[in-house]
């Protein structure tokens, strides 16, 4: 077997070749290629004339000697037009009911059925067996069919509670396409002279029958790690608890997991990674409402849980809370304490300065910086006599902010523990302390916990960096996940600097 990274590079080059000349269809081509390489089915929803059939035709060129069949369904379509006409000779000579399948669906590797919901019951029932079992009953015999990819298309969804739901459930990947939006792409499409029937894929990139068969075995060997399963189960529980969530059958979940295994395999990995789960957004929706719902739920999962983002923020919150507790304990020890000397008949208590505050001017440190008079303040200088007068009689108290300029009025009080507390305009307060008494260093316990958390964050970010090279995931998702991880990292760094 080819080296995993060489295989991933080859599939990437194959996809690029298939995408050539198709504008704003890269994601659709890549997911259809993934479906073809893993033997799954795709439903394309969108208005007429947006290259749905061309996407299917292109996928034929991914394989060596692949045969294609396409058909536009109508209400009057018959099984003979899809599965082949009856053999008059066999019926006449031998009385056998047998179809001539050459050139029809039973002998095609790539199948495109347009306006699929207009098919009648006879076609739908046979098609269900073909998709489920890859078998076709031709008269008295069961014939194995080589179909690797079924692409069904329509400009509408099947009606709810109709006989079409069984077939719709078999279409694992569902893509909602629209017209070309970008101006430059629209112009390029208009002036393109590329022949749609040309094969854009070099022979060296095309997949042989032997490779395809071997890859089916290799895909099944890709492991599903426990942490990834837990994410999938979390998503399943979230959907089960939402009132408007689509019903997802166990069969659909199982087929979706195989698609995730294929994504991992063709990305050069031996195990499903959280990044692969983004593919579920194209597998689990039913209509426009559930499509938006799946996008929202997967974004919550990817940006909050897949790389432990929310768990790390919860841990950080606990560390910060513990730090505040330790700071409060330290604050009680280092805060500047005055002496209460209120008499028995005094209307209000009055205080005196402690013996260590004997200088004519006192500089007291804020245990936490505050913004006072539009200035970030870390210490205040008081005239000792003015401070003594305020402690005895109350009234206005002034101090020089950071020891400079004129003395400014302060909102200051003595709390129940006999500590001086200064408050800003929003009434947030901090205690004052003598220089040398305040402990500025971070407690060793907190420092160690933050370092451990930062190391865990680096490991998660490294995991994401190693896994993000996935051809089948749109770059927009990678940007959102990276932003969520960077936000967690920034909050950790801010906590370390406080």
UniProtKB/Swiss-Prot annotation:
Amino acids binding ADP: 23, 49-54, 196
Any GO CC annotation of this UniProt entry: cytoplasm
Gene Ontology molecular-function annotations: ATP binding; ATP hydrolysis activity
UniProt-listed Enzyme Commission number(s): 3.6.1.-
Keywords, alphabetical: ATP-binding, Chaperone, Cytoplasm, Hydrolase, Nucleotide-binding
Subcellular location per the Swiss-Prot or TrEMBL entry: Cytoplasm
Gene3D superfamilies: 1.20.58.1510, 2.40.128.430, P-loop containing nucleotide triphosphate hydrolases (3.40.50.300)
InterPro entries with a match to the protein in the record: AAA+_ATPase, ATPase_RavA, ATPase_RavA_C, MoxR, P-loop_NTPase, RavA-like_AAA_lid, RavA_ATPases, RavA_LARA_dom
Reactions catalysed according to its record: ATP + H2O = ADP + phosphate + H(+)
Protein purpose: Component of the RavA-ViaA chaperone complex, which may act on the membrane to optimize the function of some of the respiratory chains. RavA functions as an ATPase.
Subunit-structure text: Homohexamer. Interacts with ViaA.
Family membership: Belongs to the RavA family.
Protein name, entry field: Regulatory ATPase RavA
